[in-house]
Amino acid sequence: MDFEHIPVLFNDTVNSLEIKPDGLYVDCTAGGGGHSHAVAQRLSDKGRLIAIDRDPEAIEVLKARFASFPNVEIVHNTFDNISAILNGRKADGIMADLGVSSHQIDTAERGFSFHMDAPLDMRMSKEGKSAADVVNTYSENELYRIIRDYGEERYAKSIAKNIVK
C-alpha cells in the first residue's frame, strides 16, 4: 500500500528534537513514517523510537517500513494514551503532526475530500460512526452543537437546519 504524505515542517521538526543517538523519541502521529524514519536513522542501537498511529492502514505501512529497525516500536493507538504507552519511560523528544494526512485526503474511500465522489466517512480509523451516519441520523440540535463547538462556525444553526432538510 502506498501511503504518500507530505510532512509539515519536516527539517524544522526533526532538527528541533536535537536527537541523542541513545535517546527515546515518540512520534505521536506517525502516519507514513516520514518524520519517524528521519529520527530512526539518527539513533544508535541503544536509542528507541515509538511510532504511534490510530489509522490501521498507517500501522501496516509503518510495520513494513520499519521491519529492519529493531529499535522502532509501532503502536496502534491514539496519542492521548501516551502515558500508558510510555509506561513510566521518559521521552527525550515528542513530535505530533496533527490533523488529516495527505493520504487520507487523497484516498477517495476515506471520505475526507470534497473533490472526489465518494461516501462521506471522515474517520481516522474505521471505528465509530462515519460522517454520513452522523449527518443522516443526528437531530438538528445535535448537529448544531457539534458544528458550533467543534467547528466554531458562526452559522452553525443555519448549517444544521439545512443538513436536516
Positions of PLM-derived features:
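S-adenosyl-L-methionine-dependent methyltransferase catalytic core, i.e., the SAM/SAH-binding region
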Residues: 1-165
